Amino acid sequence: MQTLAQHLSSQGIQAPLAQLLTTLADTSKAISHAVRHGALAGVLGATEQENVQGETQKKLDVITNDMLKEALTADSTVRGLASEEEDHIVEVGQSGDFLVCFDPLDGSSNIDINSLVGTIFSVLPAPSGELSEQSFLQPGRQQVAAGYVLYGPSTMLALTTGQGVQLFTLNPETNEYLLTNEAMSISKDTSEFAINMSNQRFWEAPMQTYIADLLLGKIGPREKSFNMRWIAAMVGDVHRVLSRGGLFTYPTDNKNPEKPYKLRLMYEANPMSFLVEQAGGKASTGYETIMDILPSEIHQRVAVILGSANEVDACLEYHGQDYSEEPSL
């Protein structure tokens, strides 16, 4: 099996990007160690702080953010970074080639119940000139690399540099990432979907009708049965989609009219969309392709529908219909 370093070399990845990806991978090993120790290290539970999103920070949110921030600040290839846990961008150096956006610990509500969590990252080219928030506001198509690390029964790194999606598994004996799937591929069709059903009454009419038709199974217009899955961590649900197909969505809702979207574009939706598209899937808000969106600010939120191409298309057909009346559920 190839190590991560061997794979990056065989793919012809230039030295600066290889260095940055190695920094991210090495930091994820330390994060994996911290996550595994959990209560033994006193890192579970919440802090008294809130992040810029107004969300209460878990202790591990802060710890993992600091670990990534410290490692990336020391990496000469990094010009600046943006994190879910940082109010503003962080300028790192004057000459780095890359900007890094990341969610240090996705699914942190799962920490205290010992369920799946992960790290998501996106790498963008650093433009010339003075660094500002505007420097980061690039469409997802500009990403040069993206990936996530899943901290589960084993620690796995899914990575794309625009040459498909590769999956690496951390060998606990050698502490090396080894290539265990050289070409992750999403099936075009599926009978699985992932959505937070507790928000059903708050969804837009197209999504309500789409999900209602899935739940009707063989007696409904789709004429086949579907199973629902929900891990409550985007990183876990998207990993399942990449592993065996499916559709994952966190759609628009009016639960809080001031926050109609849940997921962040720059460090959740964009990197996951890059991975999904590279594996043969599709990613949309319901009305536009996610990676074509020009961001308006670093913590911008969007609706997300991604996964098996034909099922995403089926969902989008509902969004193109006329809903002058609310569907009956």
Swiss-Prot record:
| Residues the entry annotates as binding Mg(2+) 2 | 103, 106, 268
Binding positions for substrate?
A: 106-109, 196, 262
- Obligatory cofactor(s): Mg(2+)
* One GO location term (cellular component): cytosol
Q: What is its EC number?
A: 3.1.3.11
The UniProt note on the cofactor reads as follows: Binds 2 magnesium ions per subunit.
Where in the cell? Cytoplasm
Family to which this protein belongs: Belongs to the FBPase class 1 family.
What is the name listed in the Swiss-Prot or TrEMBL entry for this protein? Fructose-1,6-bisphosphatase class 1
Which species is this record about? Answer: Shewanella loihica (strain ATCC BAA-1088 / PV-4)
User: What high-level taxonomic lineage is stated for the organism?
Assistant: Bacteria, Pseudomonadati, Pseudomonadota, Gammaproteobacteria, Alteromonadales
Q: Gene encoding this chain?
A: fbp
